[in-house]
Curated annotation (Swiss-Prot):
Keywords: Cell membrane, Cell wall biogenesis/degradation, Glycoprotein, Glycosyltransferase, Membrane, Transferase, Transmembrane, Transmembrane helix. GO terms for biological process: cell wall organization; chitin biosynthetic process; hyphal growth. It comes from Aspergillus oryzae (strain ATCC 42149 / RIB 40). GO terms for cellular component: cell septum; plasma membrane. It is a multi-pass membrane protein. It catalyses: [(1->4)-N-acetyl-beta-D-glucosaminyl](n) + UDP-N-acetyl-alpha-D-glucosamine = [(1->4)-N-acetyl-beta-D-glucosaminyl](n+1) + UDP + H(+). Disulfide bonds: none annotated. Disruption phenotype: Exhibits hyperbranching and a lower level of conidiation. Leads to sensitivity to the chitin-binding reagent Calcofluor white (CFW). Its EC number is 2.4.1.16. It holds the Pfam family Chitin_synth_1N. This is Chitin synthase B.
Length: 916
């Protein structure tokens, strides 16, 4: 229903939204998230006086015709605004590479070619040019009028900028007409240049945030941390968050959300971007489209004091889907997005995720004082009502300090990503963790890790020591903390902070005088993308494995601090049980390399070389061939394991993709071979009573003794039942068994590589703690802010450009065009760097040297080589080898002696005939 301005006759002609053009609207009732791709926005040329999304539907049917402006939208408000467009086409879809004029899709006159077009400059270079004062326009630089802005307390630059008319008009009338005392919440974006450390971002120092300025209680602070994700991944997370906020606002019978003001005013979304340099500039266009960012307003410094973070604030009802579809409210139906209070913090320099969390908790958290903080990584899509489920966990349990939901792998449409065995294996790993591990730890009250990609904390629970210990890993505090900071840490502590979320979990549960516990909330689900390539997978797991191992040891060594907490005796009893469980798991992890090798060899020996008494043949190649095959498999296994150390100690995974891929495949084949042998053992045990030397005719005691004998067959049967059987039973109990059929085989194929490749690489690179930052050369494109004094030198002011609304609107068109251009993933180059080439040659050289020597040693000394046609025994071969070696050394020594004698004789003879 179109909004009618006050005093307007309701019988007047309403804007026409029923055309087939670019409509900014939410999904139709009943539509699913995956169906958004069918909602075209750039499909056809606009028609009618209000055919474009940026035409103001709240203006009268006609408006005075202004002088022609290359970027003004107001001409399209006049129904007879004709013009000649040399690029005019009908019914075509704009693509970033076509020659058609994209302005036609918006009903805008033809204009001068922009120097910032994507075809002429890269998105990064075009972004740099747009940061110049007045440089956002497409027709070249021009002079604008200026206004004087006072600095808060003489040092804090905080300015309100008008948002484009299209964004203002997208806000529903019931919100725009209900402004609080002339609030500029929906009409202006607020920009603050923070020139301080996050700890100094306080009201006392002149900094403030809009929700606090409006005296609103913040119940839920939703934080999205970002590094360099593309606009599709960012939109997936942001649109999912806005849909979840809509779920909360639409609650009808809530005892909390419907009291004390609108529900949307109790929720704040904060996006924290880790540096201008790594940031994807197309993502900034998406944020500008919904109103939370504008080009050309950021300041590099204020009076020479460098800006640390650029903070934008706006309340919007717009959203962009991962398919680059722009969604806006059309009515008061349940699918309409409510207003969402947003903050966008763009850090000037890349200073790591832990510093982003310091901005979130120490800067924004202390001003907003939220009850619950939800942490998301860009790329994680929260499921329907997932954020509500997380919040309800805190609302219904006053002692809950932290919680996490179920994270599952993004499988794509029709689960097509499961074709990749690596994705399927990770899907199974995530599922089993959510079915077996997380519920167990939640029952104890201490979840060892709440994943930073999808977790929540009660803000007052983590205040104090938990956050203090957590932020010791922030390198920007190294000088301030001294020996307690990064510079004073040993390599063990630095690795510990690779899994800093584990540190926060332990500190929260062990907080002195408190009884906070952690929980897993299954009803809350989040979807995340997982590595699809071997190199990316190895690099990711290095940080996870090293960080979790160090943090696990930290929690065990500091378990005594639990006695200072306020937990009751029952909770402490279960925490002690969990500690013993963790100790046992740590020991198993430490010896996993040898355990896997021994398991593999024992199973192959049991099946391939059965005892003489039971009369079984070797499986699967017969009694004579199977031992030979098994011997080859063992040597290949050991050789590949040795290769992992060579690769891990000298190469980057991206520089050795083929070697690592080969290792995964060969280890997978060996694993399948061993699994087939193990299944054969089980089948033989239950089909032939004499097959594996079980005693079945002398009572239960003798049967159990033979079952658990050193032959190992009974133990293997129990192990198979306790793993495979347990997986199936637990999955069906949780009514989520599909991964057992779609992903379990792939997991079995990759499982041995988890131990033999990932663990070896992680421990071999224990020294790599990935600290350090990258400078931001992109910040050089930002202008500086210099103050002048007024009122006799009492007031510090700066001069700021005051753009006309028409120019703001026209520049916004170009922004939306860039934001809604279909995303084309960049082609990743697999070319090796020069350093990678040198390292690869070194690896091949060392590998050839080691394996050729090992092969010689095995051929000479191994008794097993008799099976390959060697007629003599290992003792005879060793004796003959030493004879050959001694004769060879003697021959070399003789040649060297002959050479020395020849040189001596020649030199003496030449002395007699040399000319003086």
């Amino acid at each position: 229903m179109a909004y009618q301005p006050p005093g307007k006759d309701n019988g007047a002609q309403s804007p026409n939204y029923n055309d087939s053009g670019h409509r900014l609207e939410d999904l139709p009732h009943g539509a699913t998230y995956e169906e958004e791709a069918s909602t075209g926005l750039l499909s056809h040329q606009q028609g009618g006086p209000f055919g474009g999304p940026f035409d103001d539907p709240h203006q009268r049917g006609t408006s005075p015709v202004r002088p022609t402006s290359g970027y003004s939208l107001t001409e399209t408000y006049a129904p007879d605004a004709g013009f000649h467009d040399p690029y005019s086409t009908t019914g075509s879809v704009y693509s970033g590479n076509s020659a058609e004029n994209p302005a036609a899709a918006f009903g805008v006159p033809g204009r001068v070619a922009s120097p910032y077009a994507r075809s002429e400059t890269s998105s990064t270079e075009a972004w740099r040019q747009r940061q110049a004062p007045g440089g956002g326009g497409g027709g070249g630089l021009r002079r604008y009028a200026t206004r004087k802005v006072k600095l808060v307390q003489g040092s804090v630059l905080s300015v309100d900028y008008p948002v484009p008319s299209a964004i203002q008009n997208a806000i529903q009338a019931k919100y725009r007409n209900d402004l609080e005392g002339g609030s500029e919440e929906f009409t202006h974006m607020r920009y603050t240049a923070a020139t301080c450390d996050p700890n100094d971002f306080t009201l006392h120092n002149g900094y403030n945030l809009r929700p606090a300025m409006y005296n609103r209680h913040t119940e839920l602070l939703i934080a999205i941390t970002y590094y360099n994700e593309d606009k599709t991944l960012t939109a997936r997370t942001l649109h999912g968050v806005m849909q979840n906020i809509r779920d909360i606002v639409n609650l009808k019978k809530s005892e909390f959300w419907n009291k004390g003001g609108p529900a949307w005013q109790k929720i704040v979304v904060a996006l924290v971007f880790d540096g201008i340099d790594p940031c994807d500039k197309d993502t900034l266009d998406v944020l500008a489209t919904i109103g939370i960012y504008q080009d050309g307003v950021m300041k590099r410094d204020v009076d020479g004091k460098e800006t640390v973070a650029h903070i934008f604030e706006y309340t919007t009802q717009l959203s962009v889907t991962p398919n680059q579809q722009l969604i806006r409210p059309t009515d008061d139906g349940p699918t309409t997005l409510p207003p969402v209070q947003m903050m966008f913090c763009l850090k000037q320099k890349n200073s790591k995720k832990i510093n982003s969390h310091r901005w979130l908790f120490n800067a924004f958290g202390r001003i907003l004082n939220p009850e619950v903080c939800i942490l998301l990584d860009a790329g994680t899509k929260p499921g329907q009502k997932s954020l509500l489920a997380l919040w309800e966990g805190f609302y219904n349990d006053k002692d809950l300090g932290g919680a996490c939901g179920e994270i599952h792998a993004m499988l794509g449409k029709g689960w097509k990503n499961l074709i990749n065995p690596l994705v399927a294996a990770q899907n199974f790993e995530y599922k089993i963790s959510n079915i077996l591990d997380k519920p167990l730890e939640s029952s104890f009250g201490y979840v060892s890790v709440l994943p930073g990609a999808f977790s929540a904390y009660r803000f007052r629970a983590i205040m104090g020591r938990p956050l203090e210990q957590y932020f010791h890993g922030d390198h920007t505090l190294s000088k301030q903390l001294g020996k307690k900071g990064i510079e004073g840490m040993n390599i063990f502590k630095k690795n510990m902070f690779l899994a800093e979320d584990r540190i926060l979990c332990f500190e929260l549960v062990a907080k002195a005088g408190s009884k906070w516990h952690l929980s897993y909330i299954k009803a809350s689900k989040g979807e995340t993308d997982v590595p699809e390539g071997v190199a990316e997978f190895i690099s990711q797991r290095r940080r996870w494995l090293n960080g979790s191992f160090a943090a696990g040891l930290y929690s065990l060594m500091h378990f005594g601090r639990m006695y200072k907490s306020g937990h009751n005796i029952i909770r402490m009893f279960f925490l002690h049980i969990q500690m013993l469980y963790n100790v046992f798991n740590t020991i198993l992890t430490w010896f996993s390399l040898a355990s896997y090798w021994l398991t593999t060899t024992v199973i192959m020996d049991l099946v391939g070389t059965p005892s003489e008494s039971n009369g079984n043949k070797g499986f699967p190649f017969g009694k004579s061939a199977t031992p030979i095959i098994n011997t080859i498999v063992k040597y290949v296994y050991l050789g590949l394991l040795l290769l992992q150390f060579i690769l891990a100690l000298g190469n980057r995974p991206k520089g050795s993709r083929f070697s690592y891929l080969t290792s995964f495949v060969v280890f997978g084949i060996i694993q399948i071979y061993v699994v087939v042998d193990a299944l054969y053992l089980v089948v033989r045990a239950f089909t032939n009573s004499d097959a594996i030397d079980f005693v079945t005719d002398q009572g239960v005691g003798e049967f159990l003794k033979s079952f658990f004998s050193s032959s190992g067959a009974g133990i293997i049967i129990i192990a198979l039942a306790a793993t495979f059987g347990l997986y199936f039973v637990a999955s069906f109990m949780y009514l989520d068994p599909w991964h057992m059929f779609t992903s379990f085989p792939a997991y079995m194929f990759v499982q041995s590589s988890y131990i033999n490749v990932l663990n070896v690489y992680a421990f071999s690179n224990w020294h790599d703690v990935s600290w350090g930052t990258k400078g931001s050369d992109k910040a050089d494109a930002l202008p500086s802010a210099t103050t002048t004094k007024e009122d006799g030198g009492k007031e510090a002011v700066i001069e700021e450009i005051d753009k006309p609304q028409a120019d703001i609107d026209s520049q916004f068109e170009a922004t939306v065009k860039r934001a809604l251009t279909p995303y084309v993933p960049p082609v990743e180059k697999d070319e090796k760097s020069l350093d990678d080439s040198y390292k690869s040659f070194r690896t091949r050289l060392v590998t050839l040297w080691i394996f050729s020597n090992a092969f010689l040693a095995v051929c000479i000394t191994s008794d097993g080589m008799d099976k390959f046609g060697f007629t003599n025994t290992a003792t005879d071969r060793t004796s003959r080898f030493f004879q050959a070696l001694l004769w060879s050394n003697a021959a070399v020594a003789l040649v060297r002696f002959i050479g020395a004698c020849w040189f001596l004789g020649k030199t003496g003879l030449m002395c007699c005939f040399a000319r003086r």
